[in-house]
């Protein structure tokens, strides 16, 4: 699915050409090759003392409304990945977390209009007050073997790894 039609450098139309083994968008005027790269998503795995995971229920004004997910969001252009994850968790849950180690990295193909690469971090809660905010309609703690309907297939992969004891502390 083509998302871009005009060159961001000179404004002219893109042509399709086979280059480097793929169909590419090439500017008809300046010859610039436009590479469509995935966007980086970040997610924070927050576990409580009972090893329940914090999930957010997606609000009605975002994609996949009413479904649950690990607190997540897109990385800003000039943002370090750990700081981006910490920001997203706080925006959606009210909790202030510290990024620990990377737990998982997955390519996300669930949205045909936008491929993402997701990075899931383990976290440590540093403070804050748990409340649904930003694009979250609700927040809740769930046992790893009793998870509600999820928005993203890759969250399911992460939860399976957590359930199978691949928790790194």
Where in the sequence are the language-model features?
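Acidic, metal-coordinating catalytic segment for phosphate/diphosphate chemistry
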Residues: 2-43
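Conserved N-terminal beta-strand and adjoining loop/helix that marks the start
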Residues: 29-53, 74, 105
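Conserved Nudix-box catalytic region and its N-terminal flanking loop in Nudix hydrolases
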Residues: 48-91
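Unchanged
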Residues: 75-99, 104-161
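Charged phosphate-binding loop/patch that engages nucleotide di/tri-phosphates or the phosphate backbone
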Residues: 160-169
